[in-house]
Amino acid sequence: MSGHLGRVLQFHLRLYQVLGFHGLPLPGDGNPARTRRRLMAWSLFLLISLSALVLACLFSGEEFLYRGDMFGCANDALKYVFAELGVLAIYLETLSSQRHLANFWWLHFKLGGQKTGLVSLRSEFQQFCRYLIFLYAMMAAEVAIHLGLWQFQALTQHMLLFWSTYEPLVWLTYLRNLQFVLHLELLREQLTGLEREMGLLAEYSRFASETGRSFPGFESFLRRRLVQKQRIYSHVYDMLKCFQGAFNFSILAVLLTINIRIAVDCYFMYYSIYNNVINNDYYLIVPALLEIPAFIYASQSCMVVVPRIAHQLHNIVTDSGCCSCPDLSLQIQNFSLQLLHQPIRIDCLGLTILDCSLLTRMACSVGTYMIYSIQFIPKFSNTYM
């Protein structure tokens, strides 16, 4: 990575380096090639260590899995297995997608993402406000629920062993999800900037149309600006493709891991309540309930900007006395076709679009799962044995 990053962005990218999620050296790192090799070796070490931890938990004779009944044991094993799936996807993709990630940041700097002057810390916080709220709200909620839970819940050996090994996997999954959000916020920033500039062009043309005041070469000016905006949009579209190339598999794995955890914990919550088992640790799914909406909100926020750009594009006046320009109309049509053929569409390997309708489908799937559990759990009671 070349260029200069703001302090907020630099700090959080450094955090992702420590977690093994970001394998590129940051601006200012000495000997970038050696730093890259060390980061990749660190990611590989974390992958092997965490995978060994999960295998040890699954096959150890200690109480990492719930031993009270096979149902609880299977639930804990399922959470470990899908957490391992998420870990594999995260670190293997980190190791294999360096080129896509490097291209993403190169395009970001090319579009003006580097801070050439002194930018106040307050401005940086405002720029990444939504990402910072998602990140630190999740961290605060997770810590607060843990601190509150263990004041009322007896800490058995099983709970100590399970949560001391499973909770790090949960945090890695959450932080990877918020890494997606950070990159989507950078995409959204470029798109909203383009929308503002298109709005200014529409205002210029409308003012010229209503007042009859313009300057020689006004048509050429508008056309040049439109061509420039088309190039910017093309670079933003390339950023999207690089984002998908860098994170596609781990997006699917992380969302699946979080969704499976929610479904399993909801199932086990009803099972515990039905069998009068005192177990309050299912409250720990509350942060998980916020993770998927946070990512989908960031994804949806990117995708909804493109129709607004198209709206501003078609607000440019071309049929007034001062700028009755067939060439300008043709340029607008060309840009419109570009928006149509290069859509900002964020999906999981082409399987499903990551918009708000996905939340509805996931809620329905968990609801269906709970309906089946309500019908089948009585069959596990002694009267049916």
Swiss-Prot record:
What GO terms in the biological process aspect are recorded for it?
A: chemosensory behavior; detection of chemical stimulus involved in sensory perception of taste; male courtship behavior; monoatomic ion transmembrane transport; response to insecticide; response to L-canavanine; sensory perception of taste; signal transduction
Indicate yes or no for the key word Acetylation: no
The portions of this protein that span the membrane are 39-59, 70-90, 132-152, 155-175, 249-269, 285-305, 348-372
Compartment(s) where it occurs, according to its Swiss-Prot or TrEMBL record: Cell membrane
Primary location recorded for the protein, binned into one broad class? membrane
Q: Which UniProt keywords apply?
A: Cell membrane, Membrane, Receptor, Transducer, Transmembrane, Transmembrane helix
Q: Any ranges marked Cytoplasmic in the topology annotation, and which?
A: 1-38, 91-131, 176-248, 306-347
Phenotype upon loss of function:
Leads to an inability to detect L-canavanine.
Its placement in the membrane is given as: Multi-pass membrane protein
**Care to name a GO molecular-function term for this sequence?**
ligand-gated monoatomic ion channel activity
Database matches in InterPro entries: 7TM_chemorcpt
Give me the Extracellular side stretches, as residue ranges.
60-69, 153-154, 270-284, 373-385
Q: Which GO terms describe its cellular component?
A: axon; dendrite; membrane; neuronal cell body; plasma membrane
Tell me the protein family, please.
Answer: Belongs to the insect chemoreceptor superfamily. Gustatory receptor (GR) family. Gr2a subfamily.
Function text: Gustatory receptor which mediates acceptance or avoidance behavior, depending on its substrates. Required for sensing and avoiding L-canavanine, a plant-derived insecticide.
Report the protein name in the record: Gustatory receptor 8a
Name of the coding gene: Gr8a
